[in-house]
């Protein structure tokens, strides 16, 4: 389940017209949501509020054998709708199968303001900060839109227990809908990187066409440790010829590590989705088959289940709403031994107004 601040961030992206479907890092978004979903640990309570249309605050208290907490603030130049945990659509905070938005050349008109017959691009921004206690770890994020296709994202973390005291990462992102690319730099090992994605079979004048083939890749290099890395991937999105249900297939490859991963995700019905993933290493010949599914019992209740056969791990999660409070509870365990070993168990409560 997304946190309140994550929901506000995605609302900012939607309001500013930024589409995340073309980000290479989110190419396997659907399978990750259905297989690698996060299970809460301990007991956590989060209280958040959008005090004004342009600012929000959030307070979290967690018990993991010892008390931890965090205080977060967010400010944006855009006026955002006020979410209330009692009326919020649960589908927006519980990620599952993600159906890609159609590519339309006219979907960025509202990003431009016309003055004197000349276009003036809106340069909206978002600033976020969070302080974790008692570790005194500070996290910050800055998002700045320069024009309808370009965005700067800056993230940083600072703490005495971190290597070099923290790290700063910059992402220069450009999304032209037909293709997208981003450049990144991180002070951690002086990392330099580039990512790109191109969509084939796209007709801007016919956004209703469901099929789409996306091909992308990334390359990065750590200057200090002289360590390169790269990966390539493709994603095919279409609809089932028999049921009309949307489905997504992906194939990713890391040639340096010899790792291949293929996924197949399908929305099996109005309230259910299913995903499988097969991982294979060409050097060690090790493989793993993972499966995950979600079922919505109602608009206010969802069950998730995933398992990996080689790792012999399983996860069970329930997300729902009790009155005006969002509840997220689950358990993860390892069934490889004679007695199943619980690796994570917890419950989260969220209230937002």
Curated annotation (Swiss-Prot):
Keywords: Membrane, Mitochondrion, Mitochondrion outer membrane, Transmembrane, Transmembrane beta strand. GO terms for cellular component: ERMES complex; SAM complex. It is found in: Mitochondrion outer membrane. It is a multi-pass membrane protein. The keyword Membrane applies. Its main location: mitochondrion. The keyword Transmembrane applies. GO terms for biological process: establishment of mitochondrion localization; mitochondrial genome maintenance; mitochondrial outer membrane translocase complex assembly; mitochondrion-endoplasmic reticulum membrane tethering; phospholipid transport; protein insertion into mitochondrial outer membrane. Component of the ER-mitochondria encounter structure (ERMES) or MDM complex, composed of MMM1, MDM10, MDM12 and MDM34. Associates with the mitochondrial outer membrane sorting assembly machinery SAM(core) complex. Component of the ERMES/MDM complex, which serves as a molecular tether to connect the endoplasmic reticulum and mitochondria. Components of this complex are involved in the control of mitochondrial shape and protein biogenesis and may function in phospholipid exchange. MDM10 is involved in the late assembly steps of the general translocase of the mitochondrial outer membrane (TOM complex). Functions in the TOM40-specific route of the assembly of outer membrane beta-barrel proteins, including the association of TOM40 with the receptor TOM22 and small TOM proteins. Lacks alpha-helical transmembrane segments, suggesting that it resides in the membrane via beta-sheet conformations similar to those predicted for other outer membrane proteins and porin. Belongs to the MDM10 family. This is Mitochondrial distribution and morphology protein 10. It comes from Yarrowia lipolytica (strain CLIB 122 / E 150) (Yeast).
């Amino acid at each position: 389940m997304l946190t309140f601040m994550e929901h506000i961030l995605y609302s900012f992206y939607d309001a500013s017209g930024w589409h995340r479907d073309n980000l290479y890092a989110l190419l396997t978004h659907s399978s990750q949501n259905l297989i690698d979903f996060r299970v809460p640990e301990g007991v956590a309570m989060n209280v958040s509020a959008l005090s004004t249309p342009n600012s929000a605050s959030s307070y979290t208290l967690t018990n993991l054998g010892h008390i931890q907490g965090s205080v977060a603030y967010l400010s944006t130049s855009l006026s955002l709708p006020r979410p209330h945990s009692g009326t919020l659509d649960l589908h927006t905070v519980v990620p599952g199968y993600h159906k890609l938005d159609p590519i339309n050349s006219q979907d960025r008109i509202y990003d431009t303001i016309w003055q004197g017959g000349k276009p003036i691009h809106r340069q909206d921004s978002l600033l976020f900060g969070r302080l974790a206690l008692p570790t005194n770890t500070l996290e910050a994020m800055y998002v700045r839109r320069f024009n309808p296709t370009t965005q700067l994202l800056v993230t940083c973390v600072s703490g005495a227990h971190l290597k070099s005291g923290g790290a700063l990462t910059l992402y220069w992102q450009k999304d032209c809908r037909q293709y997208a690319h981003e450049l990144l730099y991180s002070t951690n090992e002086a990392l330099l990187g580039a990512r790109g994605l191109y969509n084939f079979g796209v007709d801007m004048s016919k956004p209703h066409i469901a099929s789409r083939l996306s091909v992308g890749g990334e390359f990065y290099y750590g200057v200090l440790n002289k360590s390169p890395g790269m990966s390539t991937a493709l994603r095919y999105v279409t609809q089932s010829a028999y049921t009309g249900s949307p489905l997504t297939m992906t194939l990713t490859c890391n040639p340096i590590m010899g790792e291949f991963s293929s996924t197949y995700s399908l929305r099996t019905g109005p309230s259910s989705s299913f995903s499988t993933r097969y991982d294979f290493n060409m050097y060690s010949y090790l493989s793993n088959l993972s499966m995950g599914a979600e079922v919505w019992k109602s608009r206010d209740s969802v069950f998730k289940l995933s398992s990996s056969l080689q790792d012999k791990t399983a996860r069970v999660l329930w997300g729902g709403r009790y009155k005006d409070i969002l509840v997220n509870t689950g358990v993860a365990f390892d069934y490889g031994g004679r007695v199943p070993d619980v690796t994570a168990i917890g419950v989260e409560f969220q209230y937002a107004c």
